[in-house]
Amino acid sequence: MASNNVAQFAAELKMPAGVLLEQLQAAGVQKASEDDALSETDKARLLDHLRKSHGATDGDKRKITLTRRHTSEIKQADATGKARTIQVEVRKKRTFVKRDDVSETGADQAQAQTDEQAEAELKRREEEARREAELLEKQAQELRERQERLEREEAERRAREEAAEAERRRAEEEAAAKREAAAAQAEAAQQAAAAREEAQRAQSEQSEQSAQDEARAAAERAAQREAAKKAEDAAREAADKARAEQEEIRKRREAAEAEARAIREMMNTPRRAQVKAVEPPKPAEQPAAKAAEAKGTLHKPAKPAGEAAAARPAAKKPASGAPAPAAAPAGDRNKKPGTGKSGWQDDAAKRRGIKTRGDSSGGVDRGWRGGPKGRGKHQDSASSFQAPTEPIVREVHVPETISVADLAHKMAIKASEVIKVMMKMGQMVTINQVLDQETAMIVVEELGHRALAAKLDDPEALLVEGEIGSDAEQLPRPPVVTVMGHVDHGKTSLLDYIRRAKVAAGEAGGITQHIGAYHVETPRGVVTFLDTPGHEAFTAMRARGAKATDIVILVVAADDGVMPQTKEAISHAKAGGVPIVVAINKIDKPEANPDRVKQELVAEGVVPEEYGGDSPFVPVSAKTGVGIDDLLENVLLQAEVLELKAPVESPAKGIVIEAKLDKGKGPVATVLVQSGTLNRGDVVLAGTAYGRVRAMLDENGKPTKEAGPSIPVEIQGLSEVPGAGEEVIVLPDERKAREIALFRQGKFRDVKLAKQQAAKLESMLEQMGEGEVQNLPLIIKADVQGSQEALVQSLLKLSTNEVRVQIVHSAVGGISESDVNLATASKAVIIGFNTRADAQARKLAEANGIDIRYYNIIYDAVDEVKAAMSGMLAPEKREVVTGMVEVRQVFKVPKVGAVAGCMVTDGVVKRSSSVRVLRNNVVIFTGELDSLKRFKDDVKEVKQGFECGMSIKNFNDIVEGDQFEVFEVTEVARTL
């Protein structure tokens, strides 16, 4: 019925009339009672108010969703050849939104585009569905129907649950209503009783009030218990019912899933297995065979495809498998001779089925392209290979160098994978490129394998085993004493006096540039001396001397004190743990001050014995011989304290003090024997060099047959010049020495190449950052390796950010034609240190214009290279102010611009000078003079006190009162 008043409208809305009146009042509709009339306008105002207050959206815009279904049928033949009809259903969901009138045109266009896209999408999906339908079979349709049935059952279950929930809520509401009614009745009874008792007994009001409270609480508890019991019973019933329904649904779902799983397995099973399943059973074979025998024709019993392949090998090798009667039936015994490998077959086996990729029918187990000779060789198990699901982690032994291809082979992956990982790491490599050990281990770990640093098949392990096995008798040996100190402090002169020789007088420049080894016989025994250079360039030589020594004589000039190389010698001695004997030389000079030297040495940590230290200080003079005996006494005393011993009757071991390339003798090495005895004819190994000792000379150049511990000798017969500081060891077999030397050469070469390759990118980036850097290429040839090493290091230290020394090649020996050819190709300068070029090399150098420089003092070589580098530096530009000009008047000349009439106030103005324009002592322009005139004549210069006319290139903003600062730019040569 129509709701014409408030009460009827409240009944229609199923809400109290009082609440509706309050909402109408809030909406601005004034209604006093339930009987007041209510118009449609009032209802609309109430609806707007409720939408605004509850956050409802504008009702004008509405959204409509349409779902369209399109069903089509596709006919497809299955594996058995039967035609099956497959229904394809395409569902499409479309949403329409009502928009404003202003955007109707745009909406129509958008709708048209949407329709076109929808049609295209529909066609695409139909095509996809048709392609997918080709792979579907009848079981897929049955699975979809079961899933729909499950969905319907799930929807029914949800409906039942919602009904149970509604029933439970209704029961709770009834229980709450009953509880409220009981509470109201109890409260009314309590109030009546209280009124009666209050009228009768005013004095016991407080006690009666407490009784009323207790009664009210008891009534409320009773009502609550009753309501809770009812609600609990209803909830229990609903829960039992829901649990039963869920259990039933779960069972149905599990059954449906099991059935779907079986269908999927059946669909995924190869068709060969399905063909096997429909083959005739075995019991039917025997009657067929008997019938065939009755006809007089021999037949083999038909076998399944799987058994035929297994039966043939058994027939060939009866001893390897089951007994022969089990593998071949009785029909094989009657086989005709010459029938070949295949034998007789029954009619069913001769009728071959259609050849398909997944099916090999006809009882013959062949592949897709199996030939007549390959029958029965390929089993079904060959096609059932399962790829490993987990990645295989391998332990990869990485040597010091390895190529990319070998590294990939060790990890059982393609080389392209290793190249990809290297590209991700920022390095481009090829398949044959050699990687160093560190880079290769990082690549292995990036690919998920374990990298182990490998030292496999190292022939040097034999040397370690030989060291462990040597247990010869230890006998006393002479001490090895190294003389160290600053340059020009008298080390060689001191040794000359001890040896009664004059080595210092024959040295170039009066300075030692080689390490010398001598042994001196004294009344108290033999002492071996090593004389080291004091120049700063020979740091490596001094370090080798300290490594091979037992005692260090530190020579300090009494008039010079502690110098940089003195401090370096102290640090070398302390690093080697070698005792120091200090010789304060040149005490015969008037300016000598030994006490000052002692104080400086104490500051460096060398404390004399009189100050409580452990270093003897001996004042000596290499010229007069004062204190030489005391020095030797202290040295031998230190040697006795050290108790130096070494095995004598054992293969020799030592260290290379110096090495050089002699044109007549070949590679020559000065060796200090540290243990054992070195004999002529022994096979020695020194670093990458090996050979048999052909000749052995002492320090005086006299031949000797053997050298014991602490004796220096010069040996010949090595394959190449060994590195200074290399360990020398005697081996029993030349073949083993060659093997170890070649192994070291290959390892050194591979490591060097790998490091060069790793540093290529960095050096390229450095060169890009440096920009234009001048290079001074040099080829260095020296007489001995120590001098060559020192010269190379000294020259490399001269490099700056603008000029860099590039050592193209450095070696020991004379200058040959190959060196000149290398210098021609690299445009290098050849430096010969105590060496000369042969006749052919000199002619070739003159023809090609190659500069060859000879030096015998390291100072001169370093100074001349430094001067050449200074000449390669870009000159420095300096500005020199030559004059000041004041503008007195400005003239505007057509086609010329502004011309300033000026007065030269200071210096001179030249036509070729540059100029700065100053206005209020602020530079506003810098440029060049365009013209300089005096009385309409061009002049080259104007001196102070004269007037002139000037114009400036590309500048016309000249004002009276401006000043011109005239300057010239000069280039000044720079020095390092």
UniProtKB/Swiss-Prot annotation:
A Pfam family (short name) is: EF-G_D2
Q: Which Gene3D superfamilies match?
A: P-loop containing nucleotide triphosphate hydrolases (3.40.50.300), Putative DNA-binding domain, N-terminal subdomain of bacterial translation initiation factor IF2 (3.30.56.50), Translation factors (2.40.30.10), Translation initiation factor IF- 2, domain 3 (3.40.50.10050)
Tell me if Oxidoreductase is a UniProt keyword of this record.
no
Region described as G4: 585-588
PROSITE patterns per the record?
A: G_TR_2, IF2
Here the segments flagged for biased composition (Gly residues) are: 360-373
Q: Which residues form the tr-type G domain?
A: 476-645
Q: Where is the composition biased (Basic and acidic residues)?
A: 48-63, 120-181, 213-264
* UniProt region (G3), positions on chain: 531-534
Q: Where is this region: Disordered?
A: 48-85, 98-389
SUPFAM superfamilies in the record, alphabetically? Initiation factor IF2/eIF5b, domain 3, P-loop containing nucleoside triphosphate hydrolases, Putative DNA-binding domain, Translation proteins
Ranges for the region named G5 are 621-623
| Cellular compartments per GO CC | cytosol
Q: Which domain of life is it from?
A: Bacteria
Query: Listed GO molecular functions?
Result: GTP binding; GTPase activity; translation initiation factor activity
Q: Where does the protein end up?
A: Cytoplasm
Q: Which UniProt keywords apply?
A: Cytoplasm, GTP-binding, Initiation factor, Nucleotide-binding, Protein biosynthesis
Which residues does the annotated region (G1) include? 485-492
* Biased composition range(s): Low complexity: 104-115, 182-194, 201-212, 285-295, 303-331
Region of interest: G2: 510-514
The principal location of this protein is cytoplasm
Residues noted as binding GTP in the record, renumbered to the chain: 485-492, 531-535, 585-588
Which CDD domains does the record cross-reference, listed alphabetically? IF2_eIF5B, IF2_mtIF2_II, mtIF2_IVc
Q: Which family does it belong to?
A: Belongs to the TRAFAC class translation factor GTPase superfamily. Classic translation factor GTPase family. IF-2 subfamily.
Function according to Swiss-Prot or TrEMBL? One of the essential components for the initiation of protein synthesis. Protects formylmethionyl-tRNA from spontaneous hydrolysis and promotes its binding to the 30S ribosomal subunits. Also involved in the hydrolysis of GTP during the formation of the 70S ribosomal complex.
Q: What is this protein called?
A: Translation initiation factor IF-2
Q: What is the lineage of its organism?
A: Bacteria, Pseudomonadati, Pseudomonadota, Betaproteobacteria, Burkholderiales
